Amino acid sequence: MRGISSKVTRGLPTQSRLQCVDNTGAKVVQLISVLNTGGTARRYPAGGVGDLIVVTVKKGTPETRRQIFHAVIVRQRRPFRRSDGTWVQFEDNACVIVNERGEVRGSDIKGPVSREAAERWPRIAATAKQIV
């Protein structure tokens, strides 16, 4: 995991539902927790693009349902500003399931991946077909 060049707005609070865009068998996941984030007292934890999160699978194959995994957020609907001044917003909230070291569990990522997530997670950048 590396640092990223821009400060991403945290647009996904806990209990949010995300699309899983890899081929691990999970379709819809629910965000349980955001890892490696220093919180503020009484603030509801939230994650943004490039954050490592803990998810549970809500819809998918019977082998993956009701299991807990680590994942990385690759798209979010909430707009965030890049350091060059452009604003980025995607059509959906999406994540990719990874292991604890940041290696992608699946072999394919559907749809675009944000540049911030690709900078921070080189294994996701290698697997992604389109980086925006």
Positions of predicted regions on the chain:
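Short, surface-exposed linear segments at secondary-structure transitions and domain or protein termini
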Residues: 38-43, 80, 116-119
